[in-house]
Design a protein with these regions (language model features):
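Acidic, glycine-rich active-site loops and adjacent beta-strand->loop/helix elements
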Residues: 11, 78-83, 109-112, 137-142, ...
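Flexible, glycine-rich active-site loops centered on histidine and acidic residues
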Residues: 126-160
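Conserved catalytic cysteine-centered active-site region
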Residues: 34-36, 40-52, 79-133, 258-285
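Buried hydrophobic positions in well-ordered alpha/beta secondary-structure cores of metabolic enzymes
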Residues: 5-7, 33, 61, 75, ...
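A contiguous, well-structured pocket-lining segment that forms one wall/lid of small-molecule binding clefts
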Residues: 202-271
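Conserved beta-ketoacyl condensing-enzyme motif
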Residues: 5-7, 47-108, 229-230, 235-253, ...
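Catalytic phosphate/nucleotide-handling subdomain of diverse soluble enzymes
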Residues: 287-304, 316-319
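Condensing-enzyme catalytic core mediating Claisen C-C bond formation in acyl metabolism
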Residues: 1-47, 149-216, 220, 224, ...
């Protein structure tokens, strides 16, 4: 069984912060940011919350798929920036969209989260436990960054994306995933310390990243897991139509394409407009591509996420 994508949806805040505006707060400029990241602007929340964005993306996916909320069996939300530790964001989404028969829970795996959530939904569907699943990636990353830290504030934006999966007969989704907790300190967010014993001056609650370590990890491990995934099905990388990678950095995506000896046209990007939206980046891109009719039935599509943990995951399915 395969969970076929019947609908997609996305939401990004109206407020746009471009690179020129950022240069008012930190020592940077548009050229410097574009050359190193490929990012030109990012959408930033004002009154929105992570759950609000997730709900908007979910409603669009439902509308496109023509699936009724009460038909949904499972809601998974990949997020590392929910406004509450509990209840989970998925339960808020369930209530807001009226998915009265669905079970919902969150997956906290940062930028790898959406791929892991997608894999989880596919596994439930392949096991014939659930027939209809809503998988969402939503993050409010700009709440977590230090706007005086040039190494991180230029990278992130906010948004949400959703896909609606329905069970069909077909080849199951191929899946692979790994973690390396020994390198957890390379990319961290929030704090192990209670808010009462920290102060804004400590800055320990913000995102901290060893950019060089994360870059080296991504350009090595992402090609490896893609090749591992496809080898299990005796497929070559050249047989894949699209590689939808987490939209972290243009240089990372270019390096992955180069290591796989593939043309960059197989690696769609939208980070110029949205920056790194963490768990939301892949479903936002999927939604854009579907709305622009980029996919044809039978296309072989690889999703690959990578990030904090350190963690990395990939899956392949036919559209």
């Amino acid at each position: 069984m395969i969970g076929r994508i019947y609908g997609t949806g996305s939401y990004v805040p109206n407020r746009i912060v471009d690179n020129n505006e950022l240069s008012k707060y930190v020592d940077t400029n548009d050229t410097w940011i574009r050359e190193r990241t490929g990012i030109a602007r990012r959408h930033v929340i004002e009154e929105e919350t992570t759950s609000f964005m997730a709900v908007q993306a979910a409603k669009k996916a439902l509308l496109q798929s023509e699936v009724k909320p009460e038909e949904i069996d499972l809601i998974l939300v990949a997020t590392s920036s929910s406004e509450t530790i509990f209840p989970c964001t998925a339960c808020i989404v369930q209530s807001e969209i009226g998915a009265v028969h669905a079970v919902g829970y969150d997956i906290n795996a940062a930028c790898t989260g959406f791929v892991l959530a997608f894999q989880t939904a596919q596994a439930y569907i392949d096991a014939r436990i659930y027939k209809t699943a809503l998988v969402i990636g939503a993050d409010s990353m700009t709440n977590l960054v230090d706007w005086t830290d040039r190494s991180t504030c230029i990278l992130f934006g906010d948004g949400a994306g959703a896909v609606l999966l329905r069970a069909e007969e077909g080849k199951p989704c191929l899946m692979a995933a790994h973690s390396d907790g020994t390198k957890a300190n390379a990319l961290t967010g929030m704090s192990r310390h209670h808010k009462a014993v920290t102060s804004l001056e400590d800055k320990i609650t913000y995102v901290h990243m060893d950019g060089q370590a994360v870059f080296k990890f991504a350009v090595r491990k992402v090609p490896e897991i893609i090749e591992e995934l496809l080898a299990d099905a005796s497929l070559g990388v050249e047989e894949i139509d699209y590689f939808i990678l987490h939209q972290a950095n243009k240089r990372i995506i270019e390096a992955v394409a180069k290591r796989l000896r593939l043309d960059l046209t197989k690696f769609p990007m939208n980070l110029e407009e949205y920056a790194n939206t963490s768990g939301a980046s892949i479903p936002i891109l999927l939604d854009e591509m579907k709305r622009n009719q980029r996919f044809q039935r039978g296309d072989k599509v690889v999703l690959a996420g990578f990030g904090a943990g350190l963690s990395w995951a990939a899956c392949m399915f036919e559209w």
